[in-house]
Amino acid sequence: MPVNLIAVQPSDLLPVPGVRVGVAEAGIRKANRRDLTLIELAAGSRVAGVFTLNRFCAAPVQLCKQHIAGGDVRALVINTGVANAGTGEQGLADAHATCVAVGRTLGVAPEQVLPFSTGVILEALPVDRLIAGLPAAHADLREDGWFDAAHAIMTTDTLAKAVSRQVEIGGRTVTLTGISKGAGMIKPNMATMLGFLACDAAVSQALLDALTKEAADLSFNSITVDGDTSTNDSFIVVATGQAGNAEIADPLGSDFHALRDAVIDVSIRLAQAIVRDGEGATKFMTIAVEGGLDVVECRKVAYAIGQSPLVKTAFFASDPNLGRILAAIGYAGIQDLDVGGLRVWLGTAAEEVLVAELGGRAPTYREEDGVRVMKEAEITVRVDLGRGRARATVWTCDFSYDYVKINADYRS
Amino acid sequence: MPVNLIAVQPSDLLPVPGVRVGVAEAGIRKANRRDLTLIELAAGSRVAGVFTLNRFCAAPVQLCKQHIAGGDVRALVINTGVANAGTGEQGLADAHATCVAVGRTLGVAPEQVLPFSTGVILEALPVDRLIAGLPAAHADLREDGWFDAAHAIMTTDTLAKAVSRQVEIGGRTVTLTGISKGAGMIKPNMATMLGFLACDAAVSQALLDALTKEAADLSFNSITVDGDTSTNDSFIVVATGQAGNAEIADPLGSDFHALRDAVIDVSIRLAQAIVRDGEGATKFMTIAVEGGLDVVECRKVAYAIGQSPLVKTAFFASDPNLGRILAAIGYAGIQDLDVGGLRVWLGTAAEEVLVAELGGRAPTYREEDGVRVMKEAEITVRVDLGRGRARATVWTCDFSYDYVKINADYRS
C-alpha cells in the first residue's frame, strides 16, 4: 500500500510545448503490456542528466553519457522488462542498435538519442522486438502522452508517478511535467530509479547542467528504500526553450531562482513518490538533520538513521524507539560528535515532540507522546547536531514483513 | 534457529590458570535469572581491549577505557538487563559505584575493575541491586565458572557462546577460553556484542595490545548482522602469565605466532557464533573478497554484499540472485573498479561454482548449479577483484521474516 500517494489523473498532467510522447506494447519481456516509451524533443531543446555511480553501469547508461555530452539530443527511448545491464559488448551493441533505429524513425542521428532500460539484469535485450515496436510508439506521439508514459515506465511500481506545475518566468508561463519510476527493487534484480522532467523554459546549458545536478542531489539522491543502488539509475531534465522567456543565463537572477525552485519542487515530489511506493512501505519518514558543520555530515547522520534496519523495523511497529535512533546517530561516522550537544524530535504535521537532549532521553519526554506521533503514517525525525549551520534532508520508508516477502518470494 | 551452532557443554570449556569466574542472580531487570558475572584475575595478569566507536559510548565503556589504560586490572564485572548507555552523568556515577563495590569485595582498587553492561539503553542502572548481588557472585568464584558465565552474559542470544583450546608455546601448554554474546540487537534496543578471552600465556603488554586489535579486526569487526553498531561493544583479552612460558616479546618469533594463531582462531569462532545465532538467521554466509589493492577496499566490497538487504533476502529465499551481488559490488565505493576484471563464485564445503566473469554471467554458469549451492545452510560468496593481492573476509547471515518479526514485535 503506497503511503499517501494518490493515483495521478490524465488531467493532472500538462503538455510541455516542444515535447511529444508515445508508448507501445513491444513485448520486450511480457506480452500485452506497454513497455516502450518514445519521447521526441523539438529542435533547440537542451538536455542535462545525472546517472548511477554503480560500477556495473548498464550499457544504455554508458551510451547516454556519451550522447548527452555531444549535445543536440532529440529523443529519449525507454524500455521496461530488461535492463540491459551486465551484458558486456553485446549490451552496448544492442543499445546502439536501439539508437540507430530511433534515429531512423525520427530522422535524427543515433547520437541524438538517449536510451534507457529498466528490468532484469544479466539478460540480453531483445532488441529486435524493441525495434519492431518503434513504429507504434512513433504513431502514438502526442503532447498529452505523459499519462501513458508514466504507466509505461512502471516495473514493480504499484502506482504511476507524475507531477506537473507551472511558474511565471520573465512574464511567460513555464510548464514543467515529470514522471518517475522505482519502488525498491525490480524482479528479479535491482530497483532502477528513472526520472524524466521536461519544461519549456529557455535556459543556458551551463545553468541547466548545474540545476540538474542540484535537483538530483536534493531529490533522487536524498531518498533511500533499502540502501542499494541500481545499475541503471538516471535523471534527465529537458528544457525546450519554447516558453518565449528570455534565455536564463544569470545564476543570481530572479528568473533562474524561479526555475530552480520549480524544478527542485517537481524533482522532490517525483522522488518522494518512489519512497511512498517503496516495497512494503507503511510509513513515510522524513529525516531532517540540521546544525551540522557541513552538508556531508548532515547526510551521513540522515542516512545512518534512514538506512538502519533496526530504526526502520521500529517505525513499522509504530515504536518510538529512541535508543535505535540515537545509536544510529552515534555510529554515523562523525568522529568528534559531542552527543551531549544534540537534540532529537519526533514530529508530524500537527506536533513535534522533543525526545532527546544532553546525551539521553529529554526530561520532558513522555512515552505516550512518542507513541502518539509514531501512529501516524507521515513522521519526521528532526536532529539538531548543535555544531554548525548546515542541514540535509533524506526521505525513507519503514521496513515491513512485506519487504522481506516481496524480495524473497518473487520466484515462487 | 541458530545455523550450525551447537550447545556448548561444561566439559568443552577449560579453566585458565589465574582466572576465577562467578555468577549470581542480582535481579537487575528481571528476577530469577543469572544476570551478574564476576571475573577475578590473578596478580600480574595483563589485559587489553577494544571498544565500540559509537559516539553514544556507554558509561561503563568510558570507565573501561580509563581503567585499562592504568594497567594492573584485577577484575571484570558484567551485568545484563540494563546497558547503562545514554544515561549521562548518573550513568558514569553508577558505573563508578559498581567498580568501587567490586574493588571492596575483592580487595583491589576501583581503577583495577573493568565494568561491562548490556541490555536496554536510556534506562538507569539499578546499581543497588547490582551491588547487593556481588557477594553471591564472589562466593561463586571458581576456575570452572566459564560455562555459567557464558549463560549469564546472554541477552537475546538463543545459545551460549564459548570456546576453549590449547596450544604448545615454548614447551608449555597454554590454555585459551573465551565467551561471547550478541545476536543482532537486544530488547528493546541495540545489540551489544561482548567478547572475553582469557589465556595463561606470558606475553608483553605491547604484543597483547597489538594482538587484541588484530584479533578484533579479524573477528568481531568482520561480522555483520544488520549493520548497526552498539553503544557497548567490547572485546577483552586477558593473559595471566601462569603457563610458565618465557614471556613472549618478539613479534617475529614462533612463540608469538603460535599465540597469535590461537587467539585469532578462538576470536573468530566466538564472533562467528554471534552470526550463527543472528536474529532470524537461517543461513551462515562467508563473504571472501580477494585480489584487492588493499584490505580497506576488500572490506568495502565484502560489507556491501554482506549488508545488502536485497542480497540477504535472496539468501533467505535460497535464490542464486547474481544480479544483486554484482550490483552490491558495483556500489561498494571502488571508484576505478573494472567490472570486466572481476570474478564471483558461490560455494559450499563441497563445491565452488563460478557465476560471474567479464562483467556479467559466466558462460559456464548454469542456474541449477547456483540453486544447488544456495540450498545449503553455509554458503561462501568469493569475489576476486582482479587488481591486487589484498584480501578480507566478512561473515553474515540472511534476512528473514523472523528478523522483522523479532525487531518489530518485541513490545507485544
Swiss-Prot record, chains A, B:
- Give the Gene3D superfamilies listed for this entry: ArgJ beta chain, C-terminal domain, L-amino peptidase D-ALA esterase/amidase
Instruction: Spell out the subunit comment.
Output: Heterotetramer of two alpha and two beta chains.
Q: What does this protein do?
A: Catalyzes two activities which are involved in the cyclic version of arginine biosynthesis: the synthesis of N-acetylglutamate from glutamate and acetyl-CoA as the acetyl donor, and of ornithine by transacetylation between N(2)-acetylornithine and glutamate.
Q: What class of enzyme is it?
A: transferase
**Swiss-Prot/TrEMBL keywords:** Acyltransferase, Amino-acid biosynthesis, Arginine biosynthesis, Autocatalytic cleavage, Cytoplasm, Multifunctional enzyme, Transferase
Q: Example GO biological process term?
A: ornithine biosynthetic process
Family membership noted in the UniProt record: Belongs to the ArgJ family.
Active-site residues (renumbered)? 192
Q: Site positions for Involved in the stabilization of negative charge on the oxyanion by the formation of the oxyanion hole, renumbered to this chain? A: 118-119
List, alphabetically, the CDD domains matched. Answer: OAT
List site positions: Cleavage. 191-192
Q: Which InterPro entries match?
A: Arg_biosynth_ArgJ, ArgJ-like_dom_sf, ArgJ_beta_C
Q: Which cell locations does it reside in?
A: Cytoplasm
Q: In which pathway does it act?
A: Amino-acid biosynthesis; L-arginine biosynthesis; L-ornithine and N-acetyl-L-glutamate from L-glutamate and N(2)-acetyl-L-ornithine (cyclic): step 1/1; Amino-acid biosynthesis; L-arginine biosynthesis; N(2)-acetyl-L-ornithine from L-glutamate: step 1/4
Major localisation: cytoplasm
> Could you say which residues bind substrate here?
155, 181, 192, 279, 407, 412
Quote the cellular component terms of the Gene Ontology held in the record.
cytoplasm
Substrates-to-products reaction catalysed: N(2)-acetyl-L-ornithine + L-glutamate = N-acetyl-L-glutamate + L-ornithine; L-glutamate + acetyl-CoA = N-acetyl-L-glutamate + CoA + H(+)
The protein, known as: Arginine biosynthesis bifunctional protein ArgJ
Give EC number(s), comma-separated: 2.3.1.35, 2.3.1.1
Which terms in the Gene Ontology molecular function aspect does this entry carry? glutamate N-acetyltransferase activity; L-glutamate N-acetyltransferase activity
